[in-house]
Amino acid sequence: MLAGFFKTIERYTPKLVSWNGSGFDLPVLHYRSLILGVPAPRYWDMGEEDRDFKFNNYIARYHTRHLDLMDVLAKYNGRANAPLDDLAKLCGFPGKLGMDGSKVWEAWSTGRADEVRAYCETDVVNTWLVYCRFRFLRGELDRTAYDAEIALVRDTLSASDAPHWKEYMAAWDAT
């Protein structure tokens, strides 16, 4: 899985968007790749191989190949960080459904991988929805494009039979 993540970086150079990714998710990937010996030259490039990466790479805090949305919205001030769950709900999105990050290890270690997967998937969607709102705030999306993206997410999730998406959509409809 880790090798696949970095192969995707190598092939497509996608923009990464996270919520506290600089503070948790990416360091976990860094340590795991170090321990397991998983190479990721494009990810670690800071302009040595590709000059475009000198001022926009995945590692530097103020660059945008990796956008830690929590960090940006807090103006890079740790005292101003807000929880994704709270912000998603304040924006009219469902937020987290029962599990939070502090319960992931317990669920995983007791064989409840499906719960962990569902938690991670809903976390990704909450992050995406807040990111879409951020792009609207910045003028990257106009109202029509923003509304279309939110409608696409709603339609896609509504078409799923997975229990966590049914619960998520019920929570969204209740907001």
Question: PLM ranges: what are they?
Answer:
Residues 9, 13-118, 122-144, 155-156, ...:
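Metal-dependent phosphoesterase core characteristic of DEDDh/y 3'-5' exonuclease domains
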Residues 145-175:
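C-terminal accessory extensions appended to soluble enzyme cores
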